[in-house]
């Protein structure tokens, strides 16, 4: 079986760093990249749509999927479980699709054990002070939750060297372009390009067809 052409992009960021908005902007600019929809046991928030934001399931169904080995990765965060469908990911990669996973650092470590070539991208805030300002500006969390998120952010930033790319979200437009550039550059790497363009090189009668 030929190595799948598709790439896996893992995007990780502390809460409040702007990951969700940046990922949405990337998907709009690069519609060929498919977002993996995670399964979650938490309650849907206002405006969230089942199957679009998450696949919302109860704890028993989640445990059943986990026991079957259906999750490429899973984690429990603040009492709620989140998981990524392994069959869906493998099917899309084998079809040559690029997949984006918007997950936490625990999930990223699990995915890279299975797919060591997965591309890790960390979205960093310009400072902890700015991150705190953004978290407080959302006006959705208690003081306890904000402090817990800030502590988690420091722990995540400690692992920043494990990622392939670091995007600092101090200016949204610049960060958006940085994220798009990563995806476009990865597609132009020699190995995947040789597979995609094998027929073209073969017609040229060149070694690029190998």
Curated annotation (Swiss-Prot):
EC id: 2.7.4.8
Entry-linked CDD domains: GMPK (cd00071)
UniProt: ATP binding residues: 13-20
Subcellular location: Cytoplasm
Catalytic activity: GMP + ATP = GDP + ADP
Disulfide bond positions: none
Pfam families: Guanylate_kin (PF00625)
GO cellular component, one term: cytosol
EC category name: transferase
Key word Signal present: no
Domain of life, per lineage: Bacteria
GO MF entries: ATP binding; guanylate kinase activity
Broad class of where this protein is predominantly found: cytoplasm
SUPFAM superfamilies according to UniProt: P-loop containing nucleoside triphosphate hydrolases
Domain (Guanylate kinase-like): residue spans on this chain: 6-184
InterPro entries for this protein: GK/Ca_channel_bsu, Guanylate_kin-like_dom, Guanylate_kinase, Guanylate_kinase_CS, P-loop_NTPase
Keywords: ATP-binding, Cytoplasm, Kinase, Nucleotide-binding, Transferase
Function statement: Essential for recycling GMP and indirectly, cGMP.
Family note: Belongs to the guanylate kinase family.
Name the record gives this protein: Guanylate kinase
Organism of derivation: Chromobacterium violaceum (strain ATCC 12472 / DSM 30191 / JCM 1249 / CCUG 213 / NBRC 12614 / NCIMB 9131 / NCTC 9757 / MK)
Organism lineage: Bacteria, Pseudomonadati, Pseudomonadota, Betaproteobacteria, Neisseriales
Gene: gmk
């Amino acid at each position: 079986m030929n190595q799948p052409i598709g790439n896996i992009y893992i995007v990780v960021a502390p809460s409040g760093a702007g990951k969700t908005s940046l990922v949405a902007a990337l998907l709009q600019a690069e519609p060929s990249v498919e977002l993996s929809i995670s399964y979650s046991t938490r309650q849907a928030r206002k405006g969230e749509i089942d199957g679009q934001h998450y696949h919302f399931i109860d704890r028993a169904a989640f445990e059943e999927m986990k026991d079957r080995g259906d999750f490429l990765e899973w984690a429990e965060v603040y009492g709620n479980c989140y998981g990524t469908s392994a069959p869906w990911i493998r099917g899309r990669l084998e079809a040559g699709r690029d997949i984006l996973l918007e997950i936490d650092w625990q999930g990223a470590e699990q995915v890279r054990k299975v797919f060591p070539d997965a591309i890790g991208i960390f979205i960093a805030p310009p400072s902890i002070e700015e991150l705190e300002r953004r978290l407080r500006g959302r006006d959705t969390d208690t003081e306890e939750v904000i402090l817990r998120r800030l502590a988690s952010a420091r722990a995540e930033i400690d692992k920043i060297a494990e990622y392939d790319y670091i995007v600092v979200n101090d200016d949204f437009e610049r960060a958006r372009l940085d994220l798009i550039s990563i995806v476009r550059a990865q597609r132009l790497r020699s190995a995947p390009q040789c597979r995609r363009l094998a027929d073209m090189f073969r017609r040229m009668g060149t070694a690029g067809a190998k």
